[in-house]
């Protein structure tokens, strides 16, 4: 029944900071949901080229509501890359889902609409690592504090020196 044909909605979820900091890896997750029938092909594209390395896709779509005969389906896939590759803002990641509204065995005529075939995708760009962690922040604050104290000490020493020179000049004037 063509009235029950629903194309997928596709979303890409970015890797967690915890995963990146603990494993030096980044896993992007693609989720295709709400489609019926379950005829889809999912692929990952990085910088305009299809990739297979680091990809793990569910073996088949799952029913969102298994109790219903005409339940819509969902499918997930993961792409794992190095943390440094993910942290390059020039890298472009795209999850593409090709959806076939009818199977190859279904026939269609002029009285029946052509098979629904769509490409639905979602994307993400690499995120630059701003370099701030709690440790680097604390080190930066400590360095700034030490630098401030050095500059303050230097300014105080300069003020004492100038005051001493002014005082000596005033004493010499009184002697004349």
From Swiss-Prot:
> What are the protein's UniProt keywords?
Adaptive immunity, Cell membrane, Disulfide bond, Glycoprotein, Immunity, Immunoglobulin domain, Membrane, Receptor, T cell receptor, Transmembrane, Transmembrane helix
Cytoplasmic compartment spans: 171-176
Name the domain of life this protein comes from.
Answer: Eukaryota
Which residue spans traverse the membrane?
Answer: 150-170
Instruction: Name any Gene Ontology BP term.
Output: immune response
Location of the Ig-like C1-type domain: 8-117
User: Where is it located?
Assistant: Cell membrane
User: Which Pfam families does the UniProt record give?
Assistant: C1-set
Cited SUPFAM superfamilies: Immunoglobulin
GO CC entries: alpha-beta T cell receptor complex; membrane; plasma membrane
Fetch the InterPro entries from UniProt: Ig-like_dom, Ig-like_dom_sf, Ig-like_fold, Ig_C1-set, Immune_Resp_Modulators
Q: Which Gene3D superfamilies match?
A: Immunoglobulins
Q: What quaternary structure, including any partners, is listed in this protein's UniProt entry?
A: Alpha-beta TR is a heterodimer composed of an alpha and beta chain; disulfide-linked. The alpha-beta TR is associated with the transmembrane signaling CD3 coreceptor proteins to form the TR-CD3 (TcR or TCR). The assembly of alpha-beta TR heterodimers with CD3 occurs in the endoplasmic reticulum where a single alpha-beta TR heterodimer associates with one CD3D-CD3E heterodimer, one CD3G-CD3E heterodimer and one CD247 homodimer forming a stable octameric structure. CD3D-CD3E and CD3G-CD3E heterodimers preferentially associate with TR alpha and TR beta chains, respectively.
Instruction: List the PANTHER family hit by this protein, alphabetically.
Output: TAPASIN (PTHR23411)
Domain notes, please? The connecting peptide (CP) domain is essential for signal transmission in response to antigenic stimulation, likely downstream from ZAP70 recruitment.
Purpose of the protein: Constant region of T cell receptor (TR) beta chain. Alpha-beta T cell receptors are antigen specific receptors which are essential to the immune response and are present on the cell surface of T lymphocytes. Recognize peptide-major histocompatibility (MH) (pMH) complexes that are displayed by antigen presenting cells (APC), a prerequisite for efficient T cell adaptive immunity against pathogens.
Supply the name of the protein.
T cell receptor beta constant 1
């Amino acid at each position: 029944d063509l009235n029950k044909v629903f194309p997928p909605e596709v979303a890409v979820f970015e890797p967690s900071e915890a995963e990146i900091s603990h494993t030096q890896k980044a896993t992007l997750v693609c989720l295709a949901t709400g489609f019926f029938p379950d005829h889809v092909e999912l692929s990952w594209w990085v910088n305009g080229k299809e990739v297979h390395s680091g990809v793990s896709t569910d073996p088949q779509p799952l029913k969102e509501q298994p109790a219903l005969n005409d339940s819509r389906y969902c499918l997930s896939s993961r792409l794992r890359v190095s943390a440094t590759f993910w942290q390059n803002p020039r890298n472009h990641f795209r999850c593409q889902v090709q959806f076939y509204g009818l199977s190859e065995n279904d026939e269609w005529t002029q009285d029946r609409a052509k098979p629904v075939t769509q490409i639905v995708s979602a994307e993400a760009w690499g995120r630059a690592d701003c370099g701030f962690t709690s440790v680097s922040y604390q080190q930066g604050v400590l360095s700034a504090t030490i630098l401030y104290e050095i500059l303050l000490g230097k300014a105080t020493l300069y003020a004492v020196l100038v005051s001493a020179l002014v005082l000596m000049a005033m004493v010499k004037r009184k002697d004349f």
